[in-house]
UniProtKB/Swiss-Prot annotation:
Record gene name: mocA
Family classification: Belongs to the Gfo/Idh/MocA family.
Enzyme nomenclature, EC number: 1.-.-.-
GO cellular component: cytoplasm
Described purpose of this protein according to its UniProt entry: Could catalyze the NADH-dependent dehydrogenase reaction involved in rhizopine (L-3-O-methyl-scyllo-inosamine) catabolism.
GO molecular function: nucleotide binding; oxidoreductase activity
Pfam families: GFO_IDH_MocA, GFO_IDH_MocA_C3
Cysteines joined through disulfide linkages: none
NAD as UniProt keyword: yes
Sorted UniProt keywords: NAD, Oxidoreductase
This protein's record includes keyword Aminoacyl-tRNA synthetase: no
Name of protein: Rhizopine catabolism protein MocA
Domain of life the protein comes from: Bacteria
InterPro entries linked: Gfo/Idh/MocA-like_OxRdtase_N, GFO_IDH_MocA-like_dom, NAD(P)-bd_dom_sf
């Protein structure tokens, strides 16, 4: 079968990772890349990858079958709209906008032009998590008490990013919110948040080093999302599930093997997107899933902001 020719919009860090993930696939190839920054384009030039300054130029060349969007989050909606109007299927990196309203706009424009839009929540393609989901859905753990999802980074990003990135619940937590919904089939509600005052690289207003969200799930169980900016062993993600018939833990992204898990999941996600673009049943996240994750992230961020402002007011007194 001829490999699906994917055009990449955005040649930054995540775009470069996608190129690596696609390199071993027999179903899909990154055939072209568009990025307005010449140096970024040069990083991916060669190996048969053609480069363009704009997505429009890339598509008009007529050599791509679909588009992968890996631009900054605040450009996702406009980029989706541009590609959808040209009739090509789209795989957009998470979170598909920086607000739930933006994700809704992306969903609407994809529906208007009748194009397939998939969102890059790659954890749905991690075999260990897929097995955990199957076990939960089959009732092997019984009725659930608690589902806990953790994401802790080795070191925080630059303070300039933290000050403008929307905070941990948006730039990190959307993965956990999507993962919790996907694993359990339940909707999180009734959110409560907590923070730690401990700092590693200096306090950043509005973005504590560690934040936690406790919620109810619609089946009557509880959910916990734990996000941290500093985990010395390395970037790590893991999940724990407590039920009436058992306990399960998935340390699916754990030093030093996290990168291999990441690349394999990204490759599986790309190949699933190709199958869906060719008319198969999609398994990846939809724009509606993106809306749901961002809705939770916005609610959590609002609660966090309220609590931080209250604490700041108390300190002033």
């Amino acid at each position: 079968m001829t490999r699906f020719r994917l055009g990449l919009v955005g040649a930054g860090r995540m775009g470069q990772v996608h190129v690596r993930a696609a390199a071993e696939s027999s179903l899909v190839e990154i055939a072209a890349v568009a990025d307005p920054i010449a140096a970024s384009r040069l990083n991916l030039a060669g190996n048969g990858i053609k480069t363009y300054e704009t997505a429009g130029d890339m598509i008009e060349a007529g050599e791509v079958d679909g588009v992968l969007i890996a631009t900054p989050s605040n450009t996702h909606v406009d980029t989706v709209a541009d590609i959808a109007a040209r009739g090509l299927p789209i795989l957009c990196e998470k979170p598909c906008g920086v607000t739930a309203e933006e994700a809704r706009k992306a969903a609407d424009v994809a529906e208007r032009y009748k194009v397939h839009l998939q969102i890059g929540y790659w954890r749905r393609f991690v075999p260990e998590l897929k097995q955990l989901r199957d076990d939960i859905r089959a009732g092997l753990l019984g009725n659930l008490y608690l589902v806990s999802c953790f994401q802790w980074d080795e070191a925080p990003p630059a303070n300039s990013f933290r000050a403008t990135g929307g905070g941990a619940f948006i730039d990190m937590g959307v993965h956990e919110f999507d993962q919790m919904r996907w694993l359990t089939g339940q909707e999180p509600t009734n959110f409560r948040v907590a923070t730690s005052k401990t700092t590693f690289a200096g306090a950043v207003k509005g973005d504590p080093d560690a934040v936690q969200l406790l919620c109810d799930l619609s089946d009557g169980s509880s959910g916990l999302v734990s996000l941290g900016r500093r985990f010395p062993p390395g970037d790590a993600c893991w999940t724990q599930v407590f039920g009436t018939s058992g306990f399960a833990e998935a340390r699916f992204f754990w030093p030093p093997d996290g990168e291999a898990v990441f690349l394999n999941a990204l490759q599986a996600q790309l190949e699933d997107f190709v199958q869906a673009a060719r008319g198969g049943a999609p398994r990846g996240a939809t724009a509606s899933d993106a809306v749901a994750a961002l809705t939770i992230a916005e609610a959590a961020t609002e609660l966090l902001s309220r609590d931080l402002n209250k604490a700041e007011g108390n300190n002033v007194r």
